[in-house]
Amino acid sequence: KTIKFIQGRTDEPIKVRAHPGDLNRDRTKTKHDWSWINAYHNVELIDSINVTLHQSMKTARCAVFYNSSSSVLSVLKGIPTFVAEESAVTWDVANHNLKTIMHPVVPDRTQWFNDLAQAHWTLEQSRNGDIYRHFEQYLPT
């Protein structure tokens, strides 16, 4: 349903990244039958075993998630992010309505970065710059 909705607004290619636990190394069906993807034009299933999340997002114009910790990387990289579930860790800095997919908002992430850092790092790591050094690689230049 989501793919069809997006295709109604753009003809750009869509890449679907399966959870790594859903595919085995030779990309055959494990937990889910992914053959439905073949019914769509210009949609590709990404090999999430051999292609990293970083590689998957390298050319992304936006990223769409239901609720996934993977959405954190797209926000860190400054990729317009869409999440559907309010409990997503990226909810506050994500778009929620796919009708805006061609003109997504990239909100100010400063407070979100602060909140994320405070939730995962010690005060000492903050003082000595570990947090900044860790996230610096993901920030747009």
What function would you assign to each model-found segment?
Residues 1, 32-33, 52, 97, ...:
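Short, solvent-exposed coil/turn linker segments
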Residues 3-48:
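Catalytic donor nucleotide-activated moiety binding site of glycosyltransferases and closely related
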Residues 12-14, 81, 119:
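Hydrophobic anchor at the start of a short beta-strand
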Residues 32-34, 82-83, 100:
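Short, hinge-like loop/turn segments at secondary-structure boundaries
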Residues 39-42, 70-72, 88-91, 105-109:
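Glycine-rich loops and low-complexity Gly/Arg-rich segments
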Residues 40-45, 79-80, 94-102:
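Active-site regions of enzymes building and remodeling cell-envelope glycoconjugates
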Residues 49-95:
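A donor-sugar binding/catalytic signature common to diverse glycosyltransferases
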Residues 93-141:
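Leloir-type glycosyltransferase catalytic cores
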